Amino acid sequence: MPLSSGKPLYFLSIPKTAGTTLYHILATYFPMDQVAPIQSLRKLIETPIGQIQRYRLIGGHYYYRVEPILGVKPVYITMFRNPVDRVISYYAHILRNPNHYAHHRVHNQTLLEFTEDQENLPLYANAQVRYLGLNRDILGVYKQLDRNSLSQNYFEQLMEGFAPNGFYDESYLECAKQRLKHFPFFGFKTWFDQSLQLLCRTFGWEIPKHYQKMMVNPNPFKSIDDKAVSNIRKQTELDHALFEHALVEFKQKYQEKVLE
């Protein structure tokens, strides 16, 4: 399906799902001046609407329902990752990055301690489902905060931790599944090459022969605590259900569009 002239492509990038790598590949299919820079949600909001509407490709950790920011309904695509692997990778990311709003609390925690600290649940509990299945009033929350709160990353913290009915409400999952029906493409970090093939077949692009993996860091853990893994599984049960649901759809699309 070629992209229509009136709708930008929006890559809803869930953290630690190979988003940076895919976005750089996506950017090669558009003129440079039509590709939005990867930036924070706050900076996207503060970008003049006239400039935003010149972009044909937009991507970042901006969640679902970005129409009020973009001024138009975009074409949504996304990537998924095994929930346990994603949480462990995100934990490692927070450890490495002192500018992350949770670093001050997490940097001295083991993975097990991280998963047992209830304050950390907003960071990762069923986060993939919450990225797709919730309606955040992004602009409304932004406008209510003063400059001091914005400068301290409080806005990002509120958006990431948004869960009006707690972290385990199955209605989030059902909503995410329904919304996914309208995504012409979604892929998986574990099957990145196959995802790239399906992406290109979906939009009529040439499949790149080579690409550079971005933001790839070696696994810093010699071993993973079994109890921590068990905790993560319980805290991401809805994510696992969405992952398995999406994988069935992905395999069917791959068979139809790539293999046949």
Regions flagged by a language model, labelled:
Residues 10-14, 75, 183-191, 227-234:
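Conserved aromatic-histidine-acidic binding/catalytic patches
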Residues 2-44, 50-70, 79:
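A cross-family signal for N-terminal binding/gating loops and helix N-caps
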Residues 36-42, 87, 209-219:
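A generic structural motif
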Residues 43-50, 54-78, 85-208:
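PAPS-dependent sulfotransferase catalytic domain
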Residues 18, 82, 187, 199, ...:
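A residue-level signal for conserved active-site and pocket-lining positions in enzyme catalytic cores
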Residues 57-65, 207-260:
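PAPS-dependent sulfotransferase catalytic core
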Residues 4, 175-180, 218-226:
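Short glycine/proline-rich turn/loop motifs
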Residues 24-28, 201, 248:
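Short, well-ordered alpha-helices that flank and scaffold nucleotide-derived cofactor binding pockets
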